[in-house]
């Protein structure tokens, strides 16, 4: 939603038909169901064999190789999550031959969060919330996250 609001073409990779449908409804330009098609082939077809300018990878170890392969020469990958693990192996030649950059991101500064909030308010963007759990049910919330069945944020109420 944020990228679309900035006028960026968005390619999303999803793991189920339900997530594909929901991502399309949110306005993604291209949604690839990784269980049914080759992500890289679809990205290259859509970008006319160029690759993408940037990837935001919030999944982690399992998706890094594909994320890097999808980049164009000079592309950048923003790494901001480790749901599938923190340790990964990448093809270093594929990385440096693309002159790619990997940028780590965590939460951002207070001023960045304030700017983000203002932008979301201006564009009327609301966060996508999958489910809300009481703190006592944190174990269930974590299991849901590990199952990859959520679409959006999982909230713990304190």
Name each model-derived stretch.
Residues 43-52:
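A short acidic, Gly/Pro-enriched loop at the edge of an enzyme's catalytic core
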Residues 1-37, 42:
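Mid-domain Rossmann-like dinucleotide-binding core that forms the NAD(H)/NADP(H) cofactor-binding site
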Residues 49, 124-128, 140-158:
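C-terminal capping/lid region of NAD(P)-dependent oxidoreductase domains
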Residues 14-15, 34-38, 58-59, 83, ...:
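Short beta->alpha linker loops
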Residues 29-32, 127-133:
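Structural signal for short hydrophobic segments within the conserved structured cores
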Residues 55:
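Hydrophobic beta-strand segment of the Class I
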Residues 19, 38-43, 62-66, 115, ...:
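Short acidic active-site motifs
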Residues 6, 59-128, 157-158:
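Glycine-rich phosphate-binding loop and adjacent beta-alpha segment
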